[in-house]
Amino acid sequence: MATTINTSNKNTVKLLDILKIIFENNKTNTISEETLLSLYYIFDQTIFASLELIDKELITKYVFQPSNRYFYVVEGRKGAKYMCLIQGDYCSCPSFNFSVLLKSDSVYCKHQISSILAEIISNVKVIEFDDSEYQSQILSIESLSFKTPTHKFQQK
């Protein structure tokens, strides 16, 4: 009897679980060719954009003490910053909203993938804050999530 996997609910497979399995035996904090092929098979072209963010060291983990709450901040183009909640399956980038939530073209955006990959290979900057700064940091990052080029529309 064949086993059927339910793929209708994308939340059944979590990004963190996928990457932990792929890197389970990786003790070198590097990405081997075999691992890269596995990542490409799962995430397609998005993996290359994610790796570029890691190479440019654009991922920072904000950790709040004493609660140990955290989220990732990924720097984007033109001063934009995006907040990623890996456990909460959220990113404040436009691609997450459009491609992941609305169109369902992707399961994860490049910022989510790069955040957890950077953590796994120990290539993430960490900044610690007091818990009292949690809300203000979120508001600060969210305000920078919408720094997109303005478009001027011509009236006819």
From Swiss-Prot:
ZnF (SWIM-type) spans are 82-120
- Please state where this protein is localized: Nucleus
Can you tell which superkingdom this protein's organism belongs to?
Answer: Eukaryota
Tell me a GO cellular component. Answer: nucleus
The record, for InterPro entries, names: Znf_SWIM (IPR007527)
Q: Which is one GO molecular function term here?
A: zinc ion binding
Keywords (A to Z) from UniProt: DNA damage, DNA recombination, DNA repair, Metal-binding, Nucleus, Zinc, Zinc-finger
Answer yes or no on keyword Amino-acid biosynthesis: no
Regions crossing the membrane: none
Q: Which GO terms describe its biological process?
A: double-strand break repair via homologous recombination
Q: Does the keyword Nucleus apply?
A: yes
Signal peptide bounds: none
Q: Which family does it belong to?
A: Belongs to the SWS1 family.
Q: Which PANTHER family match?
A: ZINC FINGER SWIM DOMAIN-CONTAINING PROTEIN 7
What does the UniProt function comment say about this protein?
Answer: May be involved in the homologous recombination repair (HRR) pathway of double-stranded DNA breaks arising during DNA replication or induced by DNA-damaging agents.
Question: Under what name is this protein listed?
Answer: Zinc finger SWIM domain-containing protein 7 homolog
Recorded source organism is: Dictyostelium discoideum (Social amoeba)
